[in-house]
A protein has these predicted regions:
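Active-site helix of classical SDR
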Residues: 120, 166
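Substrate-binding pocket helix/loop in short-chain dehydrogenase/reductase
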Residues: 96-97, 101-109, 208, 212
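Short, small/polar-rich loop/turn modules that mediate ligand/substrate recognition or access, typified
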Residues: 182-187, 241-243
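C-terminal substrate-recognition "lid" of short-chain dehydrogenase/reductases
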Residues: 220-248
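Residue(s) in the substrate-gating loop at a strand-loop-helix junction
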Residues: 150
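Conserved glycine-rich Rossmann-like NAD(P)H-binding loop of the short-chain dehydrogenase/reductase
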Residues: 26-42
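Alpha-helical segment proximal to the catalytic Tyr-Lys
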Residues: 125, 179-183
Length: 253
């Protein structure tokens, strides 16, 4: 059986970094990208090298189609195939709608939604080519797309209209694309995360973090590492599990 390959966007820190290490320890070749933090890519590369994991880490912009297409092409050229795509890259923004200008709105939508569209579109032809492989069992998908979404895409959040809209759109993309690709044995799901203890949520004060934790039945934020374990588990599900937006929120909703 050939080594499986995962591609993770937003790989330099938080959930993406934890995913890279979890999939590496599970025996995958790892490809990924980040937008600006090449120093963090270097650090991650050293960790993957220490694990003996083949990897390809690139810096680029996912908000138009050129780099996502190149990223997928380079991944397949390096490793021969692609098995799992995790659309994890994204940004948050806390701001009243009336204080949100056009460029801020477009930045959030393109970062959180358009990037997943571009990467998924580029990956699908290579997933279809996996039908020719003999090392994929009949119940296993020819490809897996997992979109890292948010509970705010399900319920909405005050002062986070752009973010909530982008994640709601990502949930819609997940369900619609799953129906489109199911006849081709390609699975598409989303993990709708609650509050994860990453840099994205470091904007909250200690008092705000404590108040938010009190609203979560588990009484705490999730770690990036346990989120990565959930994504790894989801990537290994039979192809029949598709079109689902699975909440990972400690019972928050």
């Amino acid at each position: 059986m050939s080594q499986k390959t995962v591609l993770i966007t937003g790989i330099s820190r938080g959930i993406g970094r934890a995913c890279a290490l979890a999939f590496a320890k599970a025996g995958y070749a790892v490809a990924g990208c980040c937008h600006t933090r090449s120093d963090l890519l270097d650090t991650l590369s050293a960790e993957l090298t220490a694990l003996g994991t083949p990897h390809l880490l690139l810096q680029g912009e996912l908000q138009n189609s050129a780099f996502p297409t190149s990223l997928i092409e380079q991944t397949v050229a390096r490793f021969g195939h692609l098995d799992v795509l995790i659309n994890n890259a994204g940004v948050s923004m806390i701001r009243m709608l009336t204080d949100t200008d056009d460029s801020q709105w477009e930045h959030v939508i393109s970062s959180n939604l358009s990037s997943a569209f571009y990467c998924s579109r580029a990956a699908i032809p290579y997933f279809l080519k996996n039908r020719e492989r003999e090392d994929i069992s009949p119940q296993a998908p020819y490809g897996v797309i997992i979109n890292v979404s948010s509970v705010w895409g399900c319920s909405g959040a005050s002062c986070e209209v752009a973010y909530s809209a982008s994640k709601a759109g990502l949930n819609g993309l997940t369900v619609a694309l799953a129906k489109e690709l199911a006849p081709s044995n390609i699975a598409v799901n989303a993990l709708a995360c609650g509050v994860i203890d990453t840099d994205m949520n470091r904007c909250f004060s200690d008092e705000e973090r404590a108040a938010l934790a009190e609203e979560i039945p588990m009484g705490r934020f999730a770690t990036p590492e346990e989120t990565a374990e959930a994504l790894l588990l989801l990537s290994r599900m039979p192809a029949y599990l598709t079109g689902q937006v699975i909440r990972f929120d400690g019972g928050f909703l």
